[in-house]
Amino acid sequence: MTPFMTEDFLLDTEFARRLYHDYAKDQPIFDYHCHLPPQQIAEDYRFKNLYDIWLKGDHYKWRAMRTNGVAERLCTGDASDREKFDAWAATVPHTIGNPLYHWTHLELRRPFGITGKLLSPSTADEIWNECNELLAQDNFSARGIMQQMNVKMVGTTDDPIDSLEHHAEIAKDGSFTIKVLPSWRPDKAFNIEQATFNDYMAKLGEVSDTDIRRFADLQTGLTKRLDHFAAHGCKVSDHALDVVMFAEANEAELDSILARRLAGETLSEHEVAQFKTAVLVFLGAEYARRGWVQQYHIGALRNNNLRQFKLLGPDVGFDSINDRPMAEELSKLLSKQNEENLLPKTILYCLNPRDNEVLGTMIGNFQGEGMPGKMQFGSGWWFNDQKDGMERQMTQLAQLGLLSRFVGMLTDSRSFLSYTRHEYFRRILCQMIGRWVEAGEAPADINLLGEMVKNICFNNARDYFAIELN
């Protein structure tokens, strides 16, 4: 019997252990996509307690707690921090088999140093007190934890209308060497069907000093904000394409679509597709000219529980996987961007693992001469951000493309404790390659495979995003 979560956790061959301990373990973290609040990094936020850093805003945990029958007041409601933590501690023993069980105990190990102790109602007091004592120390502030975890770069997720004042404040602080850069997330500018679209156009017009009436005006406003983001070091964009659409339109049609929507009219699905296509093609060309990377997160079915959405809003754990086809529309969108050689470096993520091979083969259609891995099949996202999901994504990437050129893991998280997800990923990567060696499917060449592991853990992302590190 193998003990739970030792230093060799998941490393079930000698070759895997060598790969992890000698090549993967000490690689820095390049966290190119996350949802950390830049204000907390700028202020070097001190966390009030373990709830504040661990449960607040974590829809993964809330979802598990609801499944365990926990009342909503103990998830997102008015219960005290300690009551909410106790409800989580009572849920954790029921999460065996869920990635939350592994994540929880990896996060207690690093950075808190708690080993050999499982979170449950019987250990809740001890763990609560021990972690809270550590959180009062300087090296457990927001920046302190990032430094402990050997982070070199984080890319936050930011709206085109954001001031980026906190990124500017961080950049001016020469004592803090971790790069904290904005990522451009323009969803509200192309989701023309949303009720909030008109208000957003007014805000975008205000911050860009542009009167947005025609499609060319929208392009002008977005270009000004792209310049603003570039001035703050942005090299990355991200888009939630819950449904991939493609339909072409001429400028007169786009002007009409925008004008009628701004006048309060409801558009047809075809008109929505025309508008979104035009915005994404325009933005893709801008990214290509600037040397940016674009990310497409595809296939979420959001806000399924309308009653809870009305009470609590979005992003609180009521989303799931869509099964709408997307291969043809995605192919047309990428091909359109590529027509004039203005398809930027692109990372594609799918929420439905059924689509792994769709993306794994799609990226091979649009690779770039002289640019290894220009098109990327992104790491297992959201519901696939677990052992089986990561293994499937990497296996299918290896079978259909070049695993050695993969840009690796990202946290996609709102928590400063999520950096152990990079450790989890690295252990799974080394386990997988170690098993290939054990089965005679890959050579037992530690230099060849060790260098490949180092590249996937850090070097590939550093080179791909072309961000100069401190």
Swiss-Prot record:
Gene3D superfamilies: Metal-dependent hydrolases (3.20.20.140), uronate isomerase, domain 2, chain A (1.10.2020.10)
SUPFAM superfamilies: Metallo-dependent hydrolases
Pathway(s) this gene product operates in, as recorded in its UniProt entry: Carbohydrate metabolism; pentose and glucuronate interconversion
Listed EC numbers: 5.3.1.12
Molecular function GO terms recorded: glucuronate isomerase activity
Keywords attached to this entry: Isomerase
GO BP, sorted A to Z: D-galacturonate catabolic process; D-glucuronate catabolic process
Catalysis: reaction(s): D-glucuronate = D-fructuronate; aldehydo-D-galacturonate = keto-D-tagaturonate
Similarity section: Belongs to the metallo-dependent hydrolases superfamily. Uronate isomerase family.
Record NCBIfam families: PRK02925.1
Name the UniProt record assigns to this protein: Uronate isomerase
Species this chain originates from: Shigella boydii serotype 18 (strain CDC 3083-94 / BS512)
